[in-house]
């Protein structure tokens, strides 16, 4: 390749008629043996084939011989593409195309289409292949695929407004839990017998039982204390009465037990009481009941019965003991009571039976109530645990998606991506134009020779991994953005600023933003532009103030700043705190391109000097040389296609950058004249950079082909650091890494500790801090050095000002291990006495000649040193036992730590910021859920009536068995009341037999109806059971109204049991239960006063007190139980809601993986996303394959004056069709790798399919047939090869699936040598497929880097049993009659401007 390095004039290009269509810059250009492009710039190309109006190529042999790199992209060197590059010979194209569309657009060409000329050679089978020969049968499939593509082409038309939500909190039906639990929460891993025991004793699995006991204890601790305190009061009251010695001894024992329980509950270490409170409670209340029996054995036994019922009604209702312990307590007291009445009382047999009935009734109703209550409690506990687990899973899935997307696509693309849950598809925003940016392109020199030195593709990939990882670090550190790597090519940019705003989810939308943009500190070029702007503002601000630290990117800019006012720092510092910059807006816009360019120059020079490029710097021991080119201007950027998403850029700027790279020299930074002649260039950069004109440009001044491609030729330049500036930059970098090496370890440790402390929340204040950072409204104008140092600079006036931190004089203690202790928050750490304000690294003052200014500015600079970055800085402020000035100075160390680590290690993968964003998203989900499930706590009613409806459905369905059981209990209770009346021969006031009969029938009817679905309706259930319980209470009161009322206390006991029974129906609304309790209580009082006035004569004050206590406790217990039930349901629904969200997040994640990576790599990549070192090493996945096939498809034939945006849209439609064809017909075997400009790359055989090569050939024929039948204004050139290669992903950012190896290089060369509508294959492919496909005779071509190669042209498939059996050889002539077949071409409107229709091809064999 010629060594001359011409540069084209930007203004000349703008005037050139070829400028519009230069947006598709990336072509399939090959490297020559010296690493140069395989095509001379004198002949513009699209996809490696010259498409000038004149098909005469003076460098044809040179073009065909392009040697090249070995990689999935190294073999494809993205190159420039001007108008000529995408324009075919207009007449030639239409005169030789075998098929035409009968559309108004083509009428001028199709009026005489019956007489269309046809050429018998390569174009004679332009529609060749099995698909073309059977186009009549297969065109429907193509049309279907095209329809699928056309439905997706309008990517900017979000589907949000077309659908209702399926996963939002407002759609209650989607998450409201009404079904029963799928499995019992009491199952264990033990035997079935053990499961039965655990099920009926409500014992959880061992892993949960301990946790529930802990929660139960903490929730009941106050109630236990109050209960024990009441026991102490009751026992103390007994001491006021005379008693026998045994009673006094038991009371003393009971008093001590209650007191000991209270004492244990107030100990700091409550573990002992947590273990003992159940047996202590059981024993203490049993002894207390024994004291009651002994005290009242000489009184009426009915009082003891009443007290027994009151005590256990309260204990069962409160549920302060676990079910099994409460049952044991009741059994022990019941046994003691029964023994007492049989041994000590003088009751007759009927009374004894009556007492036993009441005792059993209390036990039966109480135990069943507590069983259901505890079951709900434990289900709620398990639900809360499951909710935490689901929340963590949801967060992890979101983190995976976030890491994956942010590693592949820029934030301003991610925030506009929408996931359509209904169609299970992703809506990608259309590419947009970025008006002002700079592009830097790298390419390895002599990559073919370098690859030959490595004995395996794996070693090549290892080398590229090491090199590009260092590239990524440099690019990120300088605030730029990596675009992509294509094999040995590396492309980055600065200044990509999206004008699109993130799409927000519509209220009625099934589509949701895939991942919202992270916080404003994330590394995307929106923020980087802000930094650029701030850096530019800083240039002017520094005229009046000396900052402690300068931004690294301002080192160059500050050289020419006037420091004449340096001595006025005392006033100017304060004046500039609230300034937003004094630069004129026009000047900022004008200079923004310079800021981008400056950063990329620093990046390029720094990369050229990396140690990894030296023989001793990489593990392979190979010197790696790069060429690079930098250009500034506008580009189009975005994502095209429907699979294997990748961000790419197109346009004249990238084309010029590639051309500069091609025409450059190894190890030198090559730029054009336009940016160098900018009015501020020399003023800003001449003192720091060596600028050398490329004198060899004159060789190209009279090259017609070059001018035709690129416009006028003007001088280009090589840029490098000056020696003194280079040394200072080295100091800066060494200081950066020496500091950040320590800080990085501390950051990781602090983040790890913080994550271990709380997996769900990220504490932004990891360190306690006494430093009061004033809230200054400093809009980053005083932009400080993000690396903790700056370089001295010379002003135009020759006045030297030193504003640096000398890394060479860094105090040794900072480099010693002990010095790391000052960066931690450990109180035992020792602070080195040498680390004081005199330490150069800790010095925050400006070392100018005015010492007074240093003193005056010190405190002010301490306040404004971080500008408006207060939030980030709080993370790393240090707590110290020393004086406050030391604390402030120590806080200044954190600047390089936070800026560097957050940018390089944190922001890119959003380690902390993304997690905070995900936390906010989850919190937002919770907040939305809370709004829908908002509860009126005083009335226990959901504000949302739909939510209330689903809650009652849930409770009813989950309590079907309990409802039946409690109806049976009610019937038994009613029978016991009847037996009691019958045994006691009571004389009721009303005819009780009729009342008992009616209620008995009612219970039987309800029991029968409970086996139907009639009670499943919430309203029916509420009304029916309200009527039943109201009738039961009224009947019970009427039944116990007797003449003379000899059993007044037993009647009161029966009313207490009735009130208790009203509360066991958990499905009944609280307001209904409250009304029933108050109604029955009032009705009993009214009846006892009005109907049976003598009843009150048999009751005492203690009876009334006990009765009221039972009523209040029942109401409170019912409120608490139903509130807990509602909370438990909300938790279960939240689990259901988050489970749905998790599943959808998994769907999105899996869809993303499938849309970006081949199926064969998904499993390993899923695991890799979770690895800790992905934050520092990125995605590193490499897999060698011994035999796979590679294909390159180049699209050409675009119109001469198409707008760039239209060209990209047309390519998007074509590539989306290819994606759909692969997905529908060849999914799993043939995989898309990527698109490079107008070239589509695919691989076959990664899944190990034995027919991979045949399927690849079928796909090539399908693509060719599609292009010639649907997109007839296009031509394709296809190349196929097969052999070994390495596939995988490498890089810290923008890591995409790619392949490397000579097989890919060979396929690229096949494509570059193919003619229009040809499928060129290697001889090895021919040998494998000659029995299945038709091929042309072999042809020997000269390929640079490979020598002479035997190739073949694939024509069609022999096996046509499904189509035309009469074919015995490939057809030589196609005749197509323009008879409309009525099959619409969905893509024709996009590709040709209007809707067209297929013509019916009729094939005739020529003699």
Swiss-Prot record:
Activity regulation statement: Regulated by cyclic AMP receptor 1 through a guanine nucleotide binding protein and protein CRAC. Both positively and negatively regulated by extracellular cAMP; this regulation is part of the mechanism that establishes the oscillatory cAMP waves during aggregation.
Domain Guanylate cyclase: from-to ranges: 438-661, 1189-1311
Consequence recorded when altering residue 498 to G: In temperature-sensitive mutant tsaca2
One GO CC term on file: uropod membrane
Effect noted on mutating residue 593 to V: In temperature-sensitive mutant tsaca2
Entry GO MF terms: adenylate cyclase activity; ATP binding; metal ion binding
Comment on bound cofactor: Binds 2 magnesium ions per subunit.
Null mutant phenotype: No cAMP synthesis. Cells are unable to aggregate, stimulation with cAMP pulses restores aggregation but slug and fruiting body formation remains very inefficient. When placed in a cAMP gradient mutants lacking ACA acquire polarity and migrate along the gradient but fail to align in a head to tail fashion and form streams. They are also unable to suppress lateral pseudopod formation, resulting in abnormal turns and inefficient chemotaxis.
Binding site for Mg(2+) 2: 443-444, 488
Gene3D superfamilies: Nucleotide cyclase
InterPro entries per record: A/G_cyclase, A/G_cyclase_CS, Nucleotide_cyclase
Binding site for Mg(2+) 1: 443, 488
Function: Coordinates cell aggregation by synthesizing the cAMP that influences differentiation and morphogenesis of cells within a developing multicellular structure.
Family named by the database record: Belongs to the adenylyl cyclase class-4/guanylyl cyclase family.
Name assigned to this protein: Adenylate cyclase, aggregation specific
Organism: Dictyostelium discoideum
